[in-house]
């Protein structure tokens, strides 16, 4: 057969039809070209928008001090690590950042990764494997789910935040090694896990707790030190049964992620995490920017105070504005404020209605959320103003009225 002879009935011919099916189900996703502007504004496909979609919770991503620190790091170290951390990619800046991160979250040791998703899909298989057991909250982020699948351990998926059901699963499992994995702040609902209760279960059933604090680091706890500090479980009260993970591209405003825990746990992960061992290290310029970010997170309490006022203002406004509507505002104390619309097409219509008003709020649809719970995921930032919140509340109040869409 000639190399260029076209095949008939190839499975490769299925992709156009499969993409069309995504369109029919209102599930096709499209990237938008964005350019950051002042405050919480973006240019989205050339249109200036007030954005409520970024995880830049403290408004640090464009901070001049971080930009300067990154430039200084680039001049000192170049723009690429050019090797994995275990070869020659572990810079002095990355080493200093790991020490700073461990101190910041009150844990003995930290390990810095280039991305959050890569962290979780790597550390879970490094901790447990065939014959072991993982207990996963039903609403965990995809990276925890994928890490569990890659581990080959038996996966027990318990109903969201149902710790009684979790304990029954722990009791029933014959596995010697048990790993509980949970978001600390759930990314699509904004609620906070009951970390003390999860830790108590670990102590009763000889389990390890892996907490993904992607959306709590920098925001929760004294000086933004995260969910463990929020619950008084860091520093002198740190437990060897907790492995803490957080990302550095959200409230910290830069990129990357880290894990923190006991010396032995972190050393094991350094030795066995494939997504760490076989990947090029994060550029040192990011580490220099992150050290500056940690200083700002610690000292700028006004950012968290302002954010809390915005959360309260939004919730108060929507509690009134959505009265009589079928839409539901989720019970969230954090910067993630979900408005559950229901059908995919309805959520997209609301998103479009906001876009025509100069507001950018993405519609989140399956498989990110369950069928029938398509929603607006409103993400608030210290970069927003009270006037920004009022503008969003007014727009949603108008769109929630019958016949407005």
Curated annotation (Swiss-Prot):
What GO biological process terms are annotated to this protein in UniProt?
A: biotin biosynthetic process
Which biological pathway? Cofactor biosynthesis; biotin biosynthesis
Q: Name one GO molecular function term.
A: 8-amino-7-oxononanoate synthase activity
- Cofactor(s) this protein requires: pyridoxal 5'-phosphate
Q: To which species is this protein native?
A: Polaromonas sp. (strain JS666 / ATCC BAA-500)
Subunit details: Homodimer.
What is this protein's function per UniProt?
Catalyzes the decarboxylative condensation of pimeloyl-[acyl-carrier protein] and L-alanine to produce 8-amino-7-oxononanoate (AON), [acyl-carrier protein], and carbon dioxide.
What EC number(s) does its UniProt record assign?
Answer: 2.3.1.47
Q: For substrate, which residues are the binding ones?
A: 29, 141, 368
This one is known as 8-amino-7-oxononanoate synthase 1
User: Which keywords does this chain's UniProt record carry?
Assistant: Biotin biosynthesis, Pyridoxal phosphate, Transferase
N6-(pyridoxal phosphate)lysine, modified sites: 250
EC primary class = transferase
